[in-house]
Amino acid sequence: MPKITAYIIAFNEAAKIEAAVNSVLWADEVLVADSNSTDNTVELAQALGARVVQVPFHGFGDLRNRTLEHCTHEWIFSLDSDERCTAEARDEILALVSGEPSHDAYLVPRRSYMMGRWIEGSGWYPNYRQPQLFRKTAMRYTLDPVHEGYELLTSKPVGHLTQAIHQFPFRNMAEVIHKMNRYSTLGAAKLTRKRASMASAFGHGLWAFIKHYIFKRGFKDGWAGFVIAFGNFEGTFYRYAKRYEETQNWQPPPSEKLTRPKP
């Protein structure tokens, strides 16, 4: 049977890394690509038997490509630290690679949870990202700093698994805000060839809210759906606002050296 490397990218994920690693202990190799975490992510992963390599962060696309260089086996299963493989997905993967797969890369459905519930709307299911199961020689990632795409190196089309993995993107509201701030900064770098203004920031942000809350039926997910839509408004607004800020060279008023007046 062909062997599988499960890789997980991580940065300061001590609160999540154990659950992620535990969910892929069935793989022949578990590799954690750490980007110089300052918490005990590395120690926790190693204690569970994962092999840890240090890969500096220069955008998610570059990070994933460099991680692939450290993967040992023919088949790759990609997992983020906020994701968990399920028993059903494990069984489907093992059965697939032990047979004669029709494809060299497979998209994996993700069942995402927020505020204690499964998010069925909001564009969060099946919520495919790049293929998460693929032959090592079949795919590379594009070099986008965030929301990276992929390039197939095979003539076969992408397949789809039927069994979902689980995703828990946010532990609390603080993580929602933190991730929005980080991703909007990374996303601003993708707008270098676009003109931005505060008006365009608001317009793009408003459309992001409407798209997720109305057209992607986020309203069906209760307050969680509203938070997701509002978070997309904020992330999109600040992505364009940060790009606009880069073009303005705003400066504070000139400082003065103030001493006590002479009598």
Region locations from a protein language model:
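Short, structured coil segments at secondary-structure junctions
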Residues: 26, 47-49, 129, 154
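Cell-envelope/extracellular polymer assembly enzymes that use nucleotide-activated donors
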Residues: 3-5
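A conserved acidic beta->alpha catalytic loop
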Residues: 23, 34-44, 80
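Conserved donor nucleotide-binding strand/loop of the catalytic core
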Residues: 42-70
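Acidic helix N-cap motif at the loop->helix transition within catalytic regions
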Residues: 18, 39-48, 88-89
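Catalytic-site signature of metal-activated, phosphate-bearing donor transferases
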Residues: 62-68, 77-79, 86-250, 257, ...
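Short, well-formed alpha-helical segments that are part of the catalytic scaffolds
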Residues: 7-29
